[in-house]
Structure formats: structure tokens, C-alpha cells
Amino acid sequence: MRVILLGAPGAGKGTQAKFITEKFGIPQISTGDMLRAAVKAGTELGLKAKSVMDSGGLVSDDLIINLVKERISQADCVNGFLFDGFPRTIPQAEALVKAGVELDNVVEIAVDDEEIVQRIAGRRVHEASGRVYHTVYNPPKIAGKDDITGEDLVQRKDDTEETVRHRLSVYHSQTKPLVEFYQQLAATQGKPKYSHIPGVGSVEVITGKVLEALS
């Protein structure tokens, strides 16, 4: 089971990724984790990536693709893998095809922007304990105060509406073409299977739809 999971920040990808990896016994691979692991292991590619990152540069697609090939050749990928947040761009997707990396499924978890803004911008955090509340879905007993200590709750900088909308616009500009790329690939080559899943409703309902798409 070789899967790409697409979805905007706040669409609930993390929950579904955890379910898929546990259900099929496959690792979740994100480029960030992969880069850190390669750097830590001191592989030739890892050292190359480190020198680029140390000088403040962006790791090239070529290097990323080679790291991906190195990563998916490891023993834990024998039953497949789940790419999380990769590929991000058309050149990366094209390079994957060119490198002969086979994929079975591309699953997009789609949630309306306004729903995502409400989900994320409503989060409030008690910094000392890490307890998370939501102004609509899980409000504290007293607005703006932690239930246990009574201390102030804060909104993280990443959770402000302005930041969320910016991240969404970046996601759409990068990912919309990717969706079309994989739809086209599925239509012309029959693989990978592309599935569009509405990410609203209970976790169980969405998980059921994901499972159906992967079967």
C-alpha cells in the first residue's frame, strides 16, 4: 500500500495518516523527518543535505527524490509507505514518476477553507500544561481561562486567522495543480487511484471513507 495523503493544514490529515499507517503496517514519511534522519545517520545524501541547510539554502528536488528512494528501500517499507506533505510541487511529482517510484493511491482530504479557519483560529492553549481548548467545539468553563488553573489561555501565532488564510492560499497554489496532475495520471495510466474525500463529519465516518478508497 503506497499512498500519498493530500489535504490542507487543519483538514485532519494527521488523524487519518495515523489510522492508515497502523491499519496497513506502513511507515509515515514526511520530508522533514526524512531529512533529519538522513542527516543524523550521516549518509552521503544526508551530509549533502546538511551542508545545503547549514548554509541557509533550500534542498533541491533532485536531492529530495534521492533521499526518498533511499528511504523507501529500507526494510520497514516492504509493505508500502505513506507520504505526508510530499510531493508538494509538480516538479517533485514528475521527478517521482521519472524515478520509477510506484504509487497505489492518492487520497485528498478536502475541507472548505472557512471550516478550516474556524477549526484552527478557534484553538486556545494553556501554555504551561499544553491543554488545548476550542472556542466553539471544546470551550473552557470560563471564556479565556484554563479549567484547572484558571490561568489565561492564548492563541498561538500559527493559529491566527491571518496566518491560517496565508497557509491555505499557499496550499491551494501548490496543491491544486498536484490534484490535477494525479487525476490526469490516473485517467491515462490507471494508476495511482485518485480519491477525493470530504473531510467533514465524525472521524469514524471520514476514516470509513478513506478505508473504502484504499480498498
Swiss-Prot record:
Compartments it resides in: Cytoplasm
The EC number(s) this enzyme carries: 2.7.4.3
MF annotations from Gene Ontology: adenylate kinase activity; ATP binding
Membrane spanning stretches: none
Metabolic or biological pathway, per its Swiss-Prot or TrEMBL entry: Purine metabolism; AMP biosynthesis via salvage pathway; AMP from ADP: step 1/1
Keywords: ATP-binding, Cytoplasm, Kinase, Nucleotide biosynthesis, Nucleotide-binding, Transferase
UniProt-listed InterPro entries: Adenyl_kin_sub, Adenylat/UMP-CMP_kin, Adenylat_kinase_CS, Adenylate_kinase_lid-dom, P-loop_NTPase
Quaternary data: Monomer.
Similarity-based family: Belongs to the adenylate kinase family.
Record's protein name: Adenylate kinase
